[in-house]
């Protein structure tokens, strides 16, 4: 999902639940008035889930690179657990906005538990 700078859902962000009843979206990222580089190399702002998704994906890729011992399901779980609505997910924000410093901490604990 996409949020604005106030962490409010945008009008163009899809909502859940999924057809099989799962919470959707999984998490949200910045998607309204996001600073981007345009085709001419200038900084501008643009909006859309096409901007929110790569931000979340890029941060998740960095997290997985830092925690290569975890599998895909564990990474998804860590990202969800780090989000600000983890305790009460809904079908507008999903699990909320991930906190990647918190995700790294949760992931490191998971790695240490797996080693025991």
Language model: regions and residue ranges:
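Residues at secondary-structure transition points
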Residues: 7, 22, 54, 100-102
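Intrinsically disordered, low-complexity, compositionally biased regions/tails
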Residues: 20, 62, 98-100, 111
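Alpha-helical scaffold segments in soluble metabolic enzymes
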Residues: 11, 26, 58, 62, ...
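Catalytic-core segments of hydrolase enzymes
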Residues: 1-38, 80-83
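Hydrolase catalytic cores
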Residues: 31-93, 97
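Short intrinsically disordered coil segments
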Residues: 15-17, 42-44, 49, 113-115
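Generic alpha-helical secondary structure signal
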Residues: 16, 71, 97-99, 104
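Secreted peptidase-domain scaffold signal
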Residues: 102-116
């Amino acid at each position: 999902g996409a949020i604005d700078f106030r962490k409010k859902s945008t009008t163009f962000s899809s909502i859940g639940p999924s057809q099989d009843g799962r919470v959707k979206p999984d998490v949200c990222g910045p998607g309204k008035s996001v600073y981007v580089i345009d085709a001419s190399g200038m900084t501008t702002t643009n909006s859309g889930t096409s901007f929110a998704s790569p931000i979340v994906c890029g941060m998740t890729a960095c997290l997985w690179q830092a925690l290569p011992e975890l599998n895909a399901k564990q990474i998804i779980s860590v990202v969800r657990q780090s989000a600000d609505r983890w305790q009460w997910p809904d079908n507008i924000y999903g699990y909320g906005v991930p906190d990647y410093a918190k995700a790294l901490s949760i992931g490191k604990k998971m790695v240490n538990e797996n080693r025991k």
